């Protein structure tokens, strides 16, 4: 479960059955997964892997090897929603043209749009088909809106705390604010050796450039609109969000 102090500290580190030698980052799109992956990869002896499945999906690995550290990233829902609208990865054209208020309320739709992001599509096809990683993992149903997707994905992400593996749960904003403090806590928590090389910060934008599939896209608001806050609050699990340090007053 989420520690009571997480809202203040911004990270939680749970030891597993063995000292980790590799790690995989999980978290929804636009939640700092690339930043955290690069930060750990540059400044520890841990080797990054993607072998446990798509990092933005629900947990669907067959097993978690004892030497693999699972790193889970979360982000404030307001900033996250704005980023999802600004870069609507894997959304079909009809989603990409929606203005922000309609985008967050629309039935969530994504497709397997590019082979290079999905090994199965690369191997056996399926380009343009619904992205099953964004469907409900049990029922297969489409999520009614963006925040319903977040709520379910967050439940899946937090389930790693129950899976008997080594887990780091971290808030993107806190790690970005104090990356060296995060790394120090990581090394201590898992008895990892201190790197011989000096700290290497992350100074440039990470991730691929988003390429829209429509000629014109609506502008994303500079901040989360006040008139949409009641919808956000009604769609999220506010108790869980607050335990993660997110309040939407």
Q: Predicted regions span which residues?
A:
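PAPS/PAP-binding and catalytic site of the sulfotransferase fold
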Residues: 34-43, 167-194
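PAPS-dependent sulfotransferases, especially Golgi type II membrane carbohydrate sulfotransferases
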Residues: 1-23, 27, 138-144, 158-161, ...
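Short, solvent-exposed coil/turn linker segments
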Residues: 99, 171-174, 198, 220
């Amino acid at each position: 479960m989420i520690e009571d102090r997480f809202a203040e500290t911004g990270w939680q580190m749970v030891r597993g059955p063995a000292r980790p030698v590799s790690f995989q980052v999980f978290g929804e799109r636009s939640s700092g997964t690339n930043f955290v992956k690069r930060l750990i990869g540059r400044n520890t002896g841990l080797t990054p892997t993607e072998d446990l499945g798509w990092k933005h999906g629900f947990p669907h690995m067959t097993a978690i090897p004892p030497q693999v550290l699972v790193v889970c990233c979360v982000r404030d829902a307001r900033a996250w929603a704005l980023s999802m609208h600004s870069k609507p990865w894997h959304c079909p054209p009809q989603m990409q043209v929606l203005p922000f208020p309609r985008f967050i309320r629309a039935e969530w739709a994504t497709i397997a749009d590019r082979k290079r992001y999905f090994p199965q599509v690369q191997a056996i096809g399926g380009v343009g088909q619904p992205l099953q990683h964004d469907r409900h993992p049990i029922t297969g149903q489409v999520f009614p809106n963006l925040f319903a997707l977040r709520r379910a994905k967050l439940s899946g992400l937090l389930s790693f705390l129950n899976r008997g593996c080594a887990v780091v749960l971290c808030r993107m904003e806190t790690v970005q604010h104090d990356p060296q403090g995060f790394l120090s806590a990581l090394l201590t928590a898992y008895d990892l050796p201190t790197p011989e090389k000096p700290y290497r910060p992350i100074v440039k934008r990470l991730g691929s450039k988003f390429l829209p599939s429509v000629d014109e896209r609506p502008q994303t608001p500079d901040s989360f609109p006040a008139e949409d806050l009641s919808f956000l609050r009604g769609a999220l699990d506010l108790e869980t969000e607050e335990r993660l340090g997110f309040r939407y007053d």
